[in-house]
Every structure is written in C-alpha cells, then in structure tokens.
C-alpha cells in the first residue's frame, strides 16, 4: 500500500486478498467466482458451477466436438456440493473480498473467535464482517480460525 501511495495511486484499493484494482476496475468475471455465484463454462476443458453442482467438460477439442455432434453433453466429471461445503466456500471466498460477508453468515459458535480478531484489529464487524488491511495479511489463518470454531 505504501508503494502505491508513494506513486500517486492512492485510489487503487485491494478488492480481494491477492488483487488490486482502481474503483470500477474490478474484473467482473473473477468476482463471479469470488462471490460464489453460478457460471456456465463453454468449450473444451471449461468448468461450470450450476445449482449445487460443479462440473467440467472434456479437454480434447475433438472429443468435445464429437460428443456435441452426437447430441451428448461433453461433461467429463461432476461434483455435488453439500450445504456445508457451500457455506464454507461462501465464508472463505467472501471474507477475501473487500466487501466481506454478512455477519449473519458466521455461526454463533465462532463469535468469540471473531471478537478476538476484532480486538486485534484484524477484522471489522458491523452488519458485515470484513478483514482490515492488517487482517488481509493473515487472511487464511483468520478464515481458518472462524470456520474451525463454527
């Protein structure tokens, strides 16, 4: 952050733990993944997340084309996502974003852990739970602590 400020880039903000962007310059495509929203991937090797299922297409273009020509879906493998997995991913991915997550997403059993990280200056809590600039440096550990306490 100091490097950005020293170069006159104070309007750049860390939109996600590992990415920086100017306001309005966020990659909307990647935000779909980080917000755990659904997407449909088209083409050989493409991945999709629809409903409570992830799947990916065959990788070889020839096989992909033959399957489509035969009227078959070119899906190579599927993975059903349980409610628990969906919750874990929503918390894990959402806390990595600047906007954070609704505080209600965190189970009551984790409130002591949240309070400890708030007191340490690593989290901000209101109706949303967000990592502070200091907390972003320790994001994986904080998220692991919260999820383990739920």
What are the residue ranges of the model-derived segments?
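Short, electropositive alpha-helical surface patch
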Residues: 20-36
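Short, amphipathic alpha-helical interaction segments positioned at domain boundaries
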Residues: 136-150
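Conserved S-adenosyl-L-methionine
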Residues: 15-19
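Hydrophobic, secondary-structure "cap" segments at the distal end of domains
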Residues: 31-34, 38-118, 128
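Single conserved hydrophobic/aromatic residue that forms the stacking wall/gate
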Residues: 2-13
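Short, glycine-/Ser/Thr-/acidic-enriched flexible segments
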Residues: 22, 47, 136
């Amino acid at each position: 952050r100091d490097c950005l400020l020293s170069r006159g880039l104070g309007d750049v903000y860390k939109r996600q733990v590992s990415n920086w962007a100017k306001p309005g310059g966020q990659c909307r495509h990647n935000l779909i993944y980080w917000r755990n929203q659904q997407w449909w991937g088209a083409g050989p090797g493409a991945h999709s997340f629809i409903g409570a299922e992830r799947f990916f297409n065959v990788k070889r273009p020839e096989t992909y084309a033959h399957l489509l020509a035969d009227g078959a879906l070119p899906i190579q493998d599927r993975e059903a996502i349980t409610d628990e997995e969906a919750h874990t991913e929503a918390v894990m991915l959402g806390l990595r974003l600047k906007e954070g997550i609704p505080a209600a997403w965190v189970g009551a059993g984790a409130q002591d852990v949240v309070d400890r990280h708030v007191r340490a200056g690593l989290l901000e809590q209101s109706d949303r739970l967000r990592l502070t600039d200091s907390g972003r440096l320790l994001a994986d550990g904080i998220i692991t602590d919260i999820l383990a306490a739920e």
